Swiss-Prot record:
Catalyzes the reversible conversion of 3-phosphohydroxypyruvate to phosphoserine and of 3-hydroxy-2-oxo-4-phosphonooxybutanoate to phosphohydroxythreonine. It comes from the Bacteria. It is found in: Cytoplasm. This is Phosphoserine aminotransferase. Belongs to the class-V pyridoxal-phosphate-dependent aminotransferase family. SerC subfamily.
Length: 361
């Protein structure tokens, strides 16, 4: 069987060693004679899974004791509602939302249902895309919190700058970049990330939040989105997707075995450089983002026309390079290079790009 590499934006590929472990556990998890999908979420073995996930997140991101960690059901999009409902209690409360692209804007649109929103555009379009430095963000003095998305999967942009806003609650959607590079958690009040890119399979969102941050909750906040209630119930306010959480636990152990976040960050830089170098040396492939704002996780590039774009997708699939089609909003090609993507996979894509340009350029 030839090597297959999944460059999809999420759900992403999983490490082979994790897939093999899942296969072994599928019918008899921890000598219980049942699958992990059948086990009670109150079972002592599964309670240990939850504890391990939290401890491994703390270890990998150096999370201090000033923060709590909860596991939420569903994707990050639900938190576009949950965040304003847990931080504001009426429409007169103001929140700053940074428009970094598709997801940053979508979060702002959802928040408007619960509070006043000040949308701050930070994307600059000249010859290429760039992002305003944080010191030039027009933050409101009286806003309750600031929300932004450090990595935009659709636009292929990233913000690597660390926030330094005084007396401001800083909230960040790290869904597509969590655990891919070191971050200073202490510079944030709330970090949340869905699991289907760098943490496991879809169905879970991890949230790290500063203790006592939720002091102004909307009285209409559903209990299932009330972060304090979820924390007090050990993330078990209702039955969780046990299999999803189990897989996330395996992926976190795998990342620790790889050497942690610093080591995987170096690998991610190598992978992305293999692709960006080809783009930058080529007159055939185009990327419209300045280097310092390019995402390591989601590489966007364009071919000269739609016909070549479609041919690239067809032939790449035949060669075991899957799910490279760009998002419908921007088109082109998107190569998502999450933690589980190997250097071997990145090299295979790079070699295919060279071949395709030589053959059709």
């Amino acid at each position: 069987m030839k090597d297959i590499f999944n460059f999809g934006s999420g759900p992403s590929m999983l490490p082979k060693i994790v897939l093999k472990k899942i296969k072994r556990d599928l019918f008899n998890w921890k000598n219980t004679n049942v699958s992990v999908m059948e086990i009670s979420h109150r079972n002592k073995n599964f309670l240990k899974v939850i504890e391990n996930i939290k401890n491994d997140i703390k270890f990998l991101l150096s999370v201090s004791n000033d923060y709590n960690i909860i596991l939420l059901q569903g994707g990050a999009r639900a938190q576009f509602s949950g965040i304003p409902m847990n931080l504001t209690n009426n429409f007169s409360d103001l929140a700053d939302y940074i428009n970094t692209g598709y997801w940053g804007m979508y979060a702002a649109i959802e928040a408007k249902k619960y509070c006043s929103v000040n949308i701050i555009d930070v994307i600059e379009k000249k010859d290429k895309l760039s992002i305003l430095p944080m010191k030039n963000w027009n933050i409101s003095k009286n806003s309750v919190y600031l929300h932004y998305c450090p990595n935009e999967t659709i636009n292929g942009t990233a913000i690597y700058e660390t926030p330094k806003f005084k007396n401001k609650i800083v909230v960040a959607d790290f869904s597509s970049t969590i655990l891919s590079r070191p971050i200073d958690v202490n510079k944030f009040d709330i970090i949340y990330a869905s699991s289907q890119k760098n943490i496991g399979v879809s169905g879970m969102t991890i949230m790290i939040f500063k203790k006592n941050i939720f002091l102004k909750q909307n009285k209409f906040t559903p209990s299932i989105l009330n972060y304090e209630i979820i924390y007090k119930n050990n993330s078990l306010f209702n039955t969780p997707p046990t299999f999803n959480w189990y897989v996330s636990g395996l992926v976190l152990k795998w990342l620790i075995d790889q050497g942690g976040v610093k080591k995987i960050n170096n690998i991610n830089k190598i992978k992305s450089k293999l692709i960006y170098d080809i783009i930058d040396k080529s007159k055939f492939y185009k990327n419209n983002i300045y280097d310092e704002y390019r995402s390591y996780m989601n590489i966007i590039f364009y071919l000269p026309n739609k016909k070549l774009n479609n041919l690239f997708l067809k032939l790449s699939k035949i060669n075991g390079l899957l799910f490279l089609k760009g998002h419908r909003a921007v088109g082109g090609i998107r190569a998502s290079m999450y933690n589980s993507m190997t250097i071997k996979g990145a090299k295979k894509l790079a070699n295919f790009m060279k071949y395709f340009e030589k053959r059709y350029g």
